[in-house]
Structure formats: C-alpha cells, structure tokens
C-alpha cells in the first residue's frame, strides 16, 4: 500500500510573531485553525482597507473550507463591531432582541423574520432588527421594510429613538458598518457562501442580549452558538431541517439553545404545539412589493401557513428573550410566546405598531 505524501506544513509561527498574510493563509490552507489574535489582525486589515481584494477573497474562502471555530468567528465579529457605528443604549438598554438569519438558504421565502420582529415588538418585547437588502433572494428585510413605507437609512440616535418610542428599530447594515464595504464588494464578486455570511447576525450595532438567529448551514450553526455563549447572550440559533434559516413549519428544526454561557442542542417539532405541516412552496415570497403585501395580510389577521411560520418565529424570539431570566422554563416559555404572538396580531396591535413605526421614521 502506497503511503500518501505528507500534507504540506504551514509556515512555523510563534504566538508572539507579528501576523502576516502568508502566515494566516498558510495555516488556513493546510486546515489549521488560527492562533489567538490572528483572526482579529486579519479582520482589522480588511476593515481598514489595508488588505487587497485577493487577500480578502483567499481569507474568506479558505476560512470557510477549513471550517471556522467559534473563537475565530468571535474575533471576526468583535473587530467588525469595533469599526461599527454603535446604537446608543443608554435609553433602551441591552435587554433587546434581534430576529435575523444568515440568508443563503436558496428558498426565497417571504420575510418571516421581519414580520416576526413586528409581532414581537407589538407583544411588548423591545426589538432592534439588524438587516440588509437582498443578497441571494428577491427581497431582503430592508427591501420589504422600505416597500412598507419605512425609512431604512436612520443613524444610531434615530434607531435608538425608534426603539424607545415605538418599541422597534431597524439598523440598516451598510449605514452602521461602513468599513465592511471592502469585504462586501469581494463577497459579492465571489458569489459563494464564505465565513462572512455568518457575520450579519453577530454584529448588530445595538448589541442586543437576546436573539433568534437563523443559520442556513447546520454545520456552522453550532459555531455561531458558541459566539453567543462567549458573550453571555440568550439566543436560539436555529436551522430548519428542510434547510431554511428560520424555524420551519415544514418539518422539524434543530435548535442550539444558548443560555448562561452554555449551548444545548435540541430537536424542535412545531407539531408539538399544534402547528400543521406546511410545504415550503406555501412560504415562498416574491419581490419587495409582494413580500410587503404578504406582511400586511398577516399583520392584518390573515390565517394560513405564513401566519403559522411568523407566530412560530415570533414565539422563538420571545423564548430567547425570556432566557435572560435564569428561571425561564422551556415549554412554558414557548406556550407564553405563542399566546402573546397570537394576541399581538389578533388584537390589531401588530398592524398598529407597523403604522406607528412607519410614521415615526418618516417624521424624523
């Protein structure tokens, strides 16, 4: 039997060495994780415009192929936040919640997280939603909110005012992460998922303590959960077993429950809470105008598969928020979240909150 040739070694590095791109890429392309501080150095080079497009592309792809660790992604996210415009939290605090996904599932569903965010806020839980325009679908959360009449270009102080006055604010990613433009251009040119796809849900400039976070890649959801655990957040990182970056109603979902610095992996079946199985085609969306129309219908009380999925994700966000309390119980938290989500829609509160939010942003 022929012995395969040895794998080429990365350049020898000492933890005290000043990083270089040859050192970083040498480790990644030979399947080795980076040493503490090396990922942060690379991301800082990217965010400050020092890294070349070739270096950025090589880093993003090789990190994804190697499979990033939670420690590496934590460094990426923290450097990105260091360069971000922060949402002031002196009036809104950090006990807010975000509902956001990585995108990239290829299903082109309606904007479930956007609708769920409005429902959660109408139920009395403060929301700071972080989002962007569509990258791979026909309509991202920002596109749909804009079609609903919302001003999406608000700065940090005005987003905080929205949360304080209305109960919900939208942080449009390009507005808060101007330094990310160097990576963003390369990411669009590459056209395939990279480690950068994980960063949107991890870099909300308001730093909410709770989140319902969707991940389109099951093998990377646990990595994201590890980042939230390091931060001491309460989060549900979810991956639909049909591939959606949402809590799905077509089958079961896998949930990584993050609470008090620990991560627990669970299988979640919405049928246990009375939800009928849907087909993914019943959740398919369209362009921004079509998705805005769907949002108006659901928030106006229309029943059906889209409402079910919105209720499920809204409840999940409230479960994550409840997890900020050490005595939160799993099943009772779900029962409470679902009841509050239904009441928020059926009472008209969600529809009214959307109208108030749109009006408030237009008057700023």
UniProtKB/Swiss-Prot annotation:
The gene is trpD. Its cofactor is Mg(2+). One of its GO terms (cellular component) is cytosol. Homodimer. Belongs to the anthranilate phosphoribosyltransferase family. One of its GO terms (molecular function) is magnesium ion binding. SUPFAM superfamilies: Nucleoside phosphorylase/phosphoribosyltransferase catalytic domain (SSF52418), Nucleoside phosphorylase/phosphoribosyltransferase N-terminal domain (SSF47648). Keywords: Amino-acid biosynthesis, Aromatic amino acid biosynthesis, Glycosyltransferase, Magnesium, Metal-binding, Transferase, Tryptophan biosynthesis. Gene3D superfamilies: Nucleoside phosphorylase/phosphoribosyltransferase catalytic domain, Transferase, Pyrimidine Nucleoside Phosphorylase, Chain C. Mg(2+) 2 binds at residues 245-246. Catalyzes the transfer of the phosphoribosyl group of 5-phosphorylribose-1-pyrophosphate (PRPP) to anthranilate to yield N-(5'-phosphoribosyl)-anthranilate (PRA). Anthranilate 2 binds at residue 187. Transmembrane segments: none annotated. Its EC number is 2.4.2.18. Mg(2+) 1 binds at residues 113, 246. Pfam families: Glycos_trans_3N, Glycos_transf_3. This is Anthranilate phosphoribosyltransferase. Binds 2 magnesium ions per monomer. 5-phospho-alpha-D-ribose 1-diphosphate binds at residues 101, 104-105, 109, 111-114, 129-137, 141. InterPro entries: Anthranilate_Pribosyl_Tfrase, Glycosyl_Trfase_fam3, Glycosyl_Trfase_fam3_N_dom, Glycosyl_Trfase_fam3_N_dom_sf, Nuc_phospho_transferase. Pathway: Amino-acid biosynthesis; L-tryptophan biosynthesis; L-tryptophan from chorismate: step 2/5. Anthranilate 1 binds at residues 101, 132. One of its GO terms (biological process) is L-tryptophan biosynthetic process. The keyword Transmembrane helix does not apply. It catalyses: N-(5-phospho-beta-D-ribosyl)anthranilate + diphosphate = 5-phospho-alpha-D-ribose 1-diphosphate + anthranilate.
């Amino acid at each position: 039997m022929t012995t395969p040739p040895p794998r080429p070694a990365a350049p020898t590095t000492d933890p005290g060495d000043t990083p270089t791109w040859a050192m970083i890429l040498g480790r990644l392309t030979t399947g080795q994780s980076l040493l503490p501080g090396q990922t942060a150095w690379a991301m800082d080079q990217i965010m400050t415009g020092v890294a070349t497009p070739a270096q950025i592309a090589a880093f993003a792809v090789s990190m994804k192929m190697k499979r990033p660790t939670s420690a590496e992604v934590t460094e990426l996210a923290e450097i990105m936040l260091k360069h971000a415009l922060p949402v002031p939290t002196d009036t809104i605090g950090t006990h807010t919640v975000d509902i956001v996904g990585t995108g990239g599932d290829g299903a082109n569903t309606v904007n479930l997280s956007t609708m769920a965010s409005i429902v959660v806020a109408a139920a009395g839980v403060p929301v700071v939603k972080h989002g962007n325009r569509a990258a791979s679908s026909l309509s991202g959360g920002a596109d749909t909110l804009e079609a609903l009449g919302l001003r999406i270009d608000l700065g940090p102080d005005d987003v905080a005012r929205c949360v304080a006055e209305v109960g919900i604010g939208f942080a449009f990613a390009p507005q808060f992460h101007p330094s990310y433009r160097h990576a963003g251009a390369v990411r669009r040119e590459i056209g395939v998922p990279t480690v950068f796809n994980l960063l949107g849900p991890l870099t909300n400039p308001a730093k909410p303590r709770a989140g319902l976070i969707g991940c389109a890649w099951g093998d990377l959801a646990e990595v994201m959960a590890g980042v939230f655990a390091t931060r001491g957040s309460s989060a549900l990182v979810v991956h639909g077993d049909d591939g959606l970056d949402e809590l799905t109603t077509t089958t079961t979902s896998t949930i990584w429950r993050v609470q008090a610095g620990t991560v627990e992996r669970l299988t979640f079946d919405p049928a246990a809470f009375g939800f009928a199985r849907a087909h993914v085609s019943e959740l398919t969306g369209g362009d921004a105008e079509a998705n805005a129309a769907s949002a108006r219908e659901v928030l106006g009380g229309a029943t059906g598969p889209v409402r079910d999925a919105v209720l499920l994700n809204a409840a999940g966000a409230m479960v994550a928020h409840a997890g900020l309390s050490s005595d939160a119980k799993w099943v009772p938290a779900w029962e409470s979240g679902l009841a509050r989500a239904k009441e928020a829609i059926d009472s008209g509160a969600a529809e009214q909150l959307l109208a108030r939010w749109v009006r408030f942003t237009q008057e700023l």
